[in-house]
Design a protein with these regions (language model features):
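Histidine-dependent nucleotide/RNA phosphoesterase domain, centered on the 2H-phosphoesterase fold
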Residues: 1-230
Length: 230
């Protein structure tokens, strides 16, 4: 995917979301369940870049705005991450041993472990009930992700990977960190305004080294895997 294509995807997502908000003034139906299992862990790959001053301020402002709203799930700064490729649904309890075939996964990952990726020109992208911080990856990162995805699809982890992507493309087009999940159909007016006031802002770049880990849904719990993990 060329960078301009991804820029157009982000722009289109924002336009579609704003149009949908215009037709729905309220928050709509409240979700009874969380987006993801809050307790179980999944296998995923990604980066945990340093939190820049501008991104730290953005998250703090969002936290202040949502602190009294029980429907808002705002990402803590310590969970700031960009997923490279999510591998499984939340399948594992905290101390549950991973299956023996994890050895195959760590062997595949060895080629990618510790590689640095850079995501540039971070900007807010709005979905009807979420706010993302998304950017443009370097071409090498796109190629690496495609290669890793193909290797996993050719492994014993194919079914887990396909189940994780039942409702999304493989690999997913956006390179993003989810800053806010709202447990309703649409964001409330204050959060819509928060986005509209900042949608043109550039939050610079994010860079980090790739890791394979057992994580909770927002990476505030993260256990990197090594060759010794079974």
């Amino acid at each position: 995917m060329k960078p301009i294509s991804l820029q157009e995807r982000y722009r289109s997502a924002n336009e579609n979301t704003v149009a949908m908000w215009a037709k729905n003034a309220g928050i709509g139906e409240v979700r009874e369940e969380s987006y993801y299992d809050p307790a179980k862990l999944a296998l995923a790959t990604g980066i945990q870049p340093p939190v820049s001053f501008n991104v730290s301020c953005l998250i703090s402002e969002l936290q202040r705005l949502t602190k009294d709203d029980p429907l808002a799930d705002t990402l803590p700064a310590q969970g700031f991450h960009f997923t490279f490729l999510p591998l499984t649904l939340p399948l594992y309890n905290l101390n549950q041993p991973l299956p023996a075939k994890v050895a195959q996964l760590t062997n595949i990952w060895a080629e990618f472990h510790g590689r640095k990726i850079v995501i540039r020109n971070l900007r807010l992208v709005a979905l009807p009930s979420q706010l993302l911080l998304a950017g443009i990856p370097e071409t090498s990162a796109i190629a690496m992700r495609q290669s890793f995805s193909e290797k996993v699809l050719a492994s014993q982890w194919k079914n887990e990977l396909l189940m994780r992507h039942t409702n999304s493309a493989l690999p997913a087009p956006f390179w993003h960190s989810t800053l806010l999940r709202y447990r309703a159909a649409f964001l409330p007016a204050a959060l819509r305004q928060f986005f509209l006031e900042r949608q043109a802002s550039d939050f610079a770049d994010a860079a980090g080294e790739l890791t394979l880990a057992k994580v909770n849904y927002n990476w505030t719990t993260c256990y990197p895997l090594t060759e010794s993990v079974r």
